Amino acid sequence: MRLHRLRARLNAVAFGLLLLLVHGQGPEIVQPEVDTTLGRVRGRQVGVKGTDRLVNVFLGIPFAQPPLGPDRFSAPHPAQPWEGVRDASAAPPMCLQDVESMNNSRFVLNGKQQIFSVSEDCLVLNIYSPAEATAGAGRPVMVWVHGGALITGAATSYDGSALAAYGDVVVVTVQYRLGVLGFFSTGDEHAPGNQGFLDVVAALRWVQGNITPFGGDLNCVTVFGGSAGGSIVSGLVLSPMAAGLFHRAITQSGVITTPGIIESHPWPLAQKITNTLACSSSSPAEMVQCLRQKEGEELVLSKKLKSTIYPLTVDGTVFPKSPKELLKEKPFHSVPFLMGVNNHEFSWLIPRGWGLLDTMEQMSREDMLAISTPVLTSLDVPPEMMPTVIDEYLGSNSDAQAKCLAFQEFMGDVFINVPTVSFSRYLRDSGSPVFFYEFQHRPSSFAKIKPAWVKADHAAEGAFVFGGPFLMDESSRLAFPEATEEEKQLSLTMMAQWTHFARTGDPNSKGLPPWPRFNQAEQYLEINPVPRAGQKFRETRMQFWSETLPSKIQQWHQKQKNRKAQEDL
């Protein structure tokens, strides 16, 4: 009898062990599956801190064919269908880039860095959808375009799970070709340029045809992006190629009118690139053919091209005219727009990436003028007038710290603040609802990596928009587990504002801070733990760039004209 009981007990233990082997010691792993027009995908399910809501995550879904071989430098082609179930549970490779150049991005928040493998076969997107979202549920869709100066970045660096869970939206993060592969242009049919921009357009087309089974509303799509991603988003508003593909837009510290982000005459840069890569030719066709035969790594790892900027191109099709001309003529898509900047844009992250930190700390007037000359030239400021611009910021200050702060303020205005305010005014005057913000909070995590004088650095708001304090995967670049209670609340508020704007075209809702519309009075929201409405953002400086400086330049040109007339007598 005792032997019988022992056998029964051993059998029970064995059965229990079998159950543990089959099911594991934790909850059963859920692998959600969804049918797209191209085939079935299997993702994974994740949790989010502070809520019981689960999120279905699908990574690396192709929206276009791999741009390889003869398709290098070409517009993207629609992805091909697949058989069976495609695994969409692992992070996809980043688009081919110099991984070393991506190191600077670890200083966005707290020193974390996510490096994924790289590949030219990278035209994929990630989807984060609330687990209870069913086909046809009709949740707002938010499509994120990452930044990185158009040369670095990855969709998977932006974990959309917290934003999806707390905002009850479907988040899509997209990848696009970068650097020479994404933006090389000969200015003609052989390499028109803008292929990285067209990748984003192709992703938006894919969303229109496939987002419904993931619980998204194809008639409620918001494009949003930060830094260079913001430049692409604002370009989507101006480009006829993106008509009807989205319904609202958000830019964070970047617009297409930023100096150097778009070029009307790409040929000189094409010559520089091909000369460096031993593909020099007077024939654009031969140039492109030579570049197509190169290994991808050779194109992106050339040390001689390390500091090269690869801009968008005014090609007559994607961008029929320059952005400034399009803004003045108002032929663009009139959609609700939320846009803004941070209060210390050029403080540390960008100067570090540009190798200017040491120079900045010992800045002289001559240094400031030399560094500023290229950008002022691109803004059509005559060399004789450039000292006037420097004096506006530097004044009579001789103190090293004052010069450093003046340089930071100048560069932040030129590259981000002035273009963003100008863009918002054009949108407002076209009749588009516009909501403007200045993010003013210094993340507590900066104490580990940045000097105490750095305030809200470039891209600092991203961790709050994406719910960094609530991300379960603490290795994620925007994960912010050390956030204070005050910062957690700020993140919850910003997620609610961004997603309510995506839902309605207005960031105002019950329980949220009042956010005035950017109209002729130019009111905006100062975002920090105690938000308040502001008016006439940086009024004196904005007036200098929009009125005072143009007037002085006009007077200078008139004097030159009069002098020449006198000399001709």
Swiss-Prot record:
Which GO cellular component terms are attached?
Answer: endoplasmic reticulum lumen
Give GO terms: molecular function aspect only.
carboxylesterase activity
> What CDD domains does the entry give?
Esterase_lipase
- TM region(s), chain numbering: none
What is the catalytic activity of this protein? a carboxylic ester + H2O = an alcohol + a carboxylate + H(+)
At which residues is glycosylation annotated? 103
Task: Look up the signal peptide feature and give its range.
Answer: 1-24
Briefly state the protein's biological role: Involved in the detoxification of xenobiotics and in the activation of ester and amide prodrugs.
What is the name attached to this protein's record? Carboxylesterase 3
Chain's gene name: CES3
